[in-house]
């Protein structure tokens, strides 16, 4: 899995559960792509498909995010610590339109709008699950 360095987006990330029981997660569905597992470095993207876009509606927050499909790989970098994790897109989410005014800051720079959700395995690679939200840069 190649992880790129070309800037794609920036915003907030949170974490979510999918697939088999693992860590803080009980067993749940395997996501829009049918492959999502909490124990693997995976993510949910709000413009996975047109149906996904219509539900997550990032445009309501002024986010015109590019379409990236199931199996696409992106590199997520914690804005504060510089820690990175390479993830495979495996689900639709987060529901960006619900978080338009939310922001997370560090080092005097704030990121707004939840633009990617990470599985617990991926989120733990760049921050503590207890933090709940992290400001991130996304590369491909």
What are these regions (language model features)?
Residues 1-140:
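Secreted/periplasmic proteins
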């Amino acid at each position: 899995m190649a992880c790129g360095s070309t800037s794609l987006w920036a915003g907030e990330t949170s974490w979510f559960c999918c697939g088999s029981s693992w860590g803080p997660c009980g067993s749940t569905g395997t996501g829009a792509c049918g492959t999502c597992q909490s124990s693997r470095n995976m993510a949910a993207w709000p413009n996975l498909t047109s149906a996904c876009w219509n539900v997550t509606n990032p445009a309501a927050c002024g986010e015109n995010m590019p379409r990236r499909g199931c199996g696409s790989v992106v590199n997520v970098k914690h804005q504060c610590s510089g820690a990175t994790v390479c993830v495979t897109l495996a689900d639709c989410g987060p529901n960006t339109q619900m978080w338009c005014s939310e922001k997370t800051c560090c080092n005097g720079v704030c990121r707004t709008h939840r633009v990617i959700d990470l599985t617990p395995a991926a989120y733990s690679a760049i921050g503590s699950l207890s933090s709940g939200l992290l400001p991130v840069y996304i590369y491909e």
